[in-house]
Every structure is written in structure tokens, then in C-alpha cells.
């Protein structure tokens, strides 16, 4: 489901539901997920590309019964990870912008395991590339990323950034329970 109208039909209270009303209060915002990778990779022109993709998409929230109840994410086990390869993990600016957007916009943010340590994976190579084990936790693991002191400098910066942002969000009711105001 890669357009908001198709997704909205599945949310409880949707005026677009075909037969009867679905009882799902929360649905996954796959259209937003598909835009996130592009939005933070492209230059934003005047009314096109880049972050305008997000602006334009959010302006269409009226199709949802409750946009605040959408599950929003940059990646999951059925998609390529936000970082599809090792080279992309070097761009922490892209990571910080995307994570900040996810944790401050409307909806219920979901972070896929490994995002905090910049795990990467390309779905086109197979499910195993996006569902790799988190490093650590087993005696045979050569690296234990459950302990922040075992992270490399880039992973540590990403980890501490997301931890700080999540702690800030936790203590900020307007971010977690407020509403989104869309301005032109």
C-alpha cells in the first residue's frame, strides 16, 4: 500500500472504507516510509523534491481518520533499511535529520532494531540482508553492540544522538501527544 488513500481505508473511522468499517485504530504509514529515503537524499527545490515531498504528503492527512495514530517508520523487516549499504552510514547528517523528523512529526514512531547503531541492508539482495542479527548477546559473537563502549566512533555518535532525542521526546508532551499544524 503505497498511497495514503489506500492505507487510510484500513483505519478505524475512515470515511473511505468500502464495506463496513475496519477496526484497526493504527495502520502503518508505508507511503511516508517510501518518501523518507528520497526526502533526505535530494535537494529541496521550490515546491518540489527533497523535504517538499514530506511537506506535500503531510498536507494530505485529511484522508486519514486519525493521522496521529499512524505508525511511522523509516524501515522495517519488509523494506530496505534506511541505510542500504556501508557507504551511506557515513552520512550522519542524513541519519540525524531522518530520525529527528520521525521522532517529532505526527504519528507513532517505530524504530527498527539496529537503527541506533547504523545497521544497513538492501532488501533487493534478500530478506537476510535487512534481518541480520543484532551484533552481540551470544557467546560466539565477536562484537557486542549491546554495550555502547564497543561501538565505533560513528555508531557511538548515532547511538548517543538518538538516545538524547528519545529522552527529550519522552519528557515533552507536546511532541508525543500534540497535533501537527501544517502551514503554507
Language-model features: locations:
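Conserved interdomain hinge at the start of the Helicase C-terminal
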Residues: 95-97
Amino acid at each position: 500500500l503505497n498511497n495514503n488513500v489506500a492505507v487510510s481505508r484500513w483505519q478505524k473511522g475512515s470515511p473511505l472504507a468500502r464495506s463496513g468499517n475496519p477496526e484497526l485504530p493504527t495502520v502503518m504509514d508505508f507511503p511516508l516510509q517510501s518518501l523518507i529515503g528520497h526526502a533526505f537524499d535530494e535537494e529541496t527545490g521550490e515546491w518540489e523534491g527533497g523535504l517538499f515531498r514530506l511537506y506535500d504528503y503531510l498536507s494530505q492527512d485529511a484522508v486519514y481518520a486519525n493521522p496521529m495514530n499512524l505508525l511511522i517508520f523509516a524501515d522495517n523487516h519488509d523494506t530496505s533499511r534506511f541505510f542500504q549499504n556501508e557507504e551511506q552510514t557515513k552520512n550522519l547528517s542524513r541519519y540525524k535529520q531522518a530520525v529527528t523528523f520521525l521522532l517529532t512529526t505526527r504519528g507513532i514512531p517505530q524504530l527498527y532494531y539496529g537503527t541506533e547503531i547504523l545497521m544497513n541492508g538492501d532488501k533487493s539482495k534478500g530478506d537476510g540482508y535487512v534481518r541480520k542479527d543484532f551484533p552481540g548477546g551470544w557467546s560466539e559473537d565477536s562484537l557486542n553492540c549491546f554495550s555502547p563502549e564497543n561501538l565505533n566512533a560513528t555508531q557511538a555518535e548515532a547511538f548517543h544522538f538518538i538516545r538524547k532525542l528519545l529522552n527529550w521526546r519522552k519528557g515533552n508532551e507536546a511532541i508525543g501527544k500534540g497535533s501537527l499544524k501544517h502551514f503554507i
